[in-house]
C-alpha cells in the first residue's frame, strides 16, 4: 500500500502570530519505519534550507539560524524513550512562532521511510 503526505496547499498567518503547518503521513501502515522527518525551505539560501528535523531517537533539531529553534516546535511528534516505546512521527505538524515577512514562502515536509522510500508534500506560507 502506498503512503502519501497530507499537507495544506496554503496556510495563512498574521505578522507576529503563530501558525501551524500541518503534515501527516497517511495511511498508517503496519511495519512502516519512519527514519527521519524534515522540514525544508527549497527557495531559501543554501545554509537556511534545512529548517527542522525529527529523528526517532534523537528527537527534534532546528539546523537553520532562520527561523531558528526559539521560533519553531513540532506540535505532536514524539521520540522513542526506550526499547519498548515507538517514536510517533506520523504527525510532523510544525508550529512557527513570531511570524515575520521573511517567513513567507514554500515549506516542504519530507518523510524518509523504510521500505517505502521518501515522500514529501509542499505548503505555501502566506504572511
Please tell me what each predicted stretch does.
Residues 19-28, 35-44, 95-98, 103-114, ...:
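Structural signature of extracellular immunoglobulin-like
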Residues 1-3:
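Proline/serine/threonine-rich low-complexity linkers at boundaries of modular beta-sandwich domains
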Amino acid at each position: 500500500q502506498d503512503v502519501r503526505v497530507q499537507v495544506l496547499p496554503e496556510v495563512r498567518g498574521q505578522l507576529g502570530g503563530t501558525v501551524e503547518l500541518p503534515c501527516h503521513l497517511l495511511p498508517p501502515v503496519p511495519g512502516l519505519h519512519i527514519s527521519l522527518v524534515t522540514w525544508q525551505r527549497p527557495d531559501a539560501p543554501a545554509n537556511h534550507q534545512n529548517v527542522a528535523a525529527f529523528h526517532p531517537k534523537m528527537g527534534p533539531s532546528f539546523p537553520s539560524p532562520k527561523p531558528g529553534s526559539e521560533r519553531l516546535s513540532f506540535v505532536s511528534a514524539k521520540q522513542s524513550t526506550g526499547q519498548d516505546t515507538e517514536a510517533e512521527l506520523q504527525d510532523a505538524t510544525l508550529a512557527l512562532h513570531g511570524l515575520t515577512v521573511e517567513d513567507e514562502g514554500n515549506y516542504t515536509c519530507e518523510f524518509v521511510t523504510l521500505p517505502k522510500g521518501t515522500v514529501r508534500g509542499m505548503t505555501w506560507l502566506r504572511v
